[in-house]
A protein has these predicted regions:
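Post-HEXXH active-site segment of zinc metalloproteases
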Residues: 81-85, 97-121
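Surface-exposed helix-capping loop/turn segments at secondary-structure junctions
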Residues: 39-45, 101, 130-137
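Short catalytic/ligand-binding loop motif for oxyanion handling, primarily in non-cytosolic enzymes
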Residues: 59-60, 95-96, 102-105, 145
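Active-site scaffold of zinc-dependent metalloenzymes
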Residues: 49-81
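A metal-dependent hydrolase signature that marks the N-terminal structural subdomain at the beginning
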Residues: 1-58, 145-169
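Short active-site segment of divalent metal-dependent hydrolases/proteases
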Residues: 88-96
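Non-transmembrane alpha-helical segments in soluble domains
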Residues: 34, 88, 120, 124-127
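Short helix/loop segments within enzyme catalytic domains
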Residues: 124-147
Length: 169
């Protein structure tokens, strides 16, 4: 107990993590994931941890340990297909982390960062495999944190035909 405050504050908090496979089942059978990790797919997925946090947001990979951090709000309320594609995107970052790549290279803007381009290309390829058209993929790529200019830049980088979408509107 702190004598001045007359309270005890326990400061040894623990961030609770869960095995990836507790929440994300059958990803070892997804061709895109198998392509990422090859023969080690099951082993890698079994080794990934996920941490859910309380803030509104999406998900990302910790550059400290390679674990996936997910907004509990997004997990509960997000579009299931978006969550699936985001997991594919984040698994690319897990692989990049395992390869020792710098995930948050500040020399690049977010949409021009090589690690992000690779992850977005992978997610877009999977979106196309699911049958999503360019307009749906553009909507998937859009977030409130990304300017319209950055969205269009990213869309072009990952080969989304934004001109074709504009013509339809």
């Amino acid at each position: 107990m702190n004598p001045q405050l007359k309270v005890t504050i326990r400061r040894d908090t623990k961030i609770i993590t869960y095995p990836f496979t507790n929440y994300f089942k059958e990803f070892d059978k997804v061709e895109a994931v198998q392509h990422l990790f090859g023969e080690k797919t099951e082993e890698v997925l079994n080794g990934i941890k996920v941490t859910f946090y309380g803030r509104v947001g999406y998900m990302g990979v910790s550059s400290a340990n390679g674990n996936i951090r997910i907004s509990a709000h997004y997990m509960k309320n997000g579009d299931l297909r978006d969550i699936y594609l985001d997991i594919i995107h984040e698994l690319v970052h897990v692989k990049q982390f395992m390869e020792g790549k710098e995930l948050r290279d500040r020399n690049f803007m977010y949409v021009e960062r090589p690690t992000e381009i690779e992850a977005y290309r992978y997610a877009v390829k999977e979106a196309k495999r699911l049958g999503m058209d360019d307009k749906e993929i553009l909507e998937y790529l859009k977030t409130e944190r990304m300017s319209e200019e950055n969205l269009m830049s990213l869309a072009k980088i990952v080969n989304i035909n934004v001109d074709k979408i504009s013509e339809k509107n």
